[in-house]
């Protein structure tokens, strides 16, 4: 069985590494320098970094220069997310040399553009599906974005290479991942799925790893690592 890829997260707000609860602005806990956090995960054995510009996602400015600095300082693979919704923001993201880019809100609001980007960039593009129930939520999670499975069907037809699935109700809560949601998304696509939100323990990671045969490829881990629920080394060992 192939192992679950782990993607420690560095979310950047106003120049700081932060974690949110339910992805809501105003719930930040700051963890200092994004570059230091990213380098610490790399030193601990991470093969991936999930790097998010929260200001860009929420439309409260951006941390573009800092995000580029962090991405370019990494020797490991970087998945870049947050506010990538037009040609300009996509070009800036790709220019960092990141391995792949997560489209979020843009996928909901400008479907024609997303189809074009998927056709042009293929495997460098993943689409973030931020879900509450079976409804997608766009732009920093404050808007309704339509039905999950209708959108998934459309993106499958357009050739989307990968999905990053977040259960907003679980994100930043340390309440455990939504395994049913992950199973349902995997059943609706033959593309790999990256799980995000709710991981609180090594058992949660083992449970997600149990879905690798169903199509789950990776798990983004944020608050549990920052809250020291377990170390990245322990997580890598538990899922190898």
Swiss-Prot record:
Principal location listed in the UniProt entry: cytoplasm
Pathway in which the depicted protein is active: Amino-acid biosynthesis; L-histidine biosynthesis; L-histidine from 5-phospho-alpha-D-ribose 1-diphosphate: step 4/9; Amino-acid biosynthesis; L-tryptophan biosynthesis; L-tryptophan from chorismate: step 3/5
Species assigned in the record: Streptomyces coelicolor (strain ATCC BAA-471 / A3(2) / M145)
Catalysed reaction, written as an equation: 1-(5-phospho-beta-D-ribosyl)-5-[(5-phospho-beta-D-ribosylamino)methylideneamino]imidazole-4-carboxamide = 5-[(5-phospho-1-deoxy-D-ribulos-1-ylimino)methylamino]-1-(5-phospho-beta-D-ribosyl)imidazole-4-carboxamide; N-(5-phospho-beta-D-ribosyl)anthranilate = 1-(2-carboxyphenylamino)-1-deoxy-D-ribulose 5-phosphate
Active site: 11 (proton acceptor), 130 (proton donor)
EC number(s) from the headed UniProt entry: 5.3.1.16, 5.3.1.24
Enzyme class: isomerase
Entry keywords, A to Z: Amino-acid biosynthesis, Aromatic amino acid biosynthesis, Cytoplasm, Histidine biosynthesis, Isomerase, Tryptophan biosynthesis
Protein's name according to its UniProt entry: Phosphoribosyl isomerase A
Signal peptide limits: none
Effect recorded for residue 171 to A: Low activity toward PRA. No activity toward ProFAR
Effect upon mutating residue 19 to A: No effect on activity toward PRA. No activity toward ProFAR
Location(s), subcellular: Cytoplasm
Molecular function in Gene Ontology: 1-(5-phosphoribosyl)-5-[(5-phosphoribosylamino)methylideneamino]imidazole-4-carboxamide isomerase activity; phosphoribosylanthranilate isomerase activity
Entry GO CC: cytoplasm
Function statement: Catalyzes the isomerization of the aminoaldose moiety of ProFAR to the aminoketose of PRFAR in the biosynthesis pathway for histidine and the isomerization of the aminoaldose PRA to the aminoketose CdRP in the biosynthsis pathway for tryptophan.
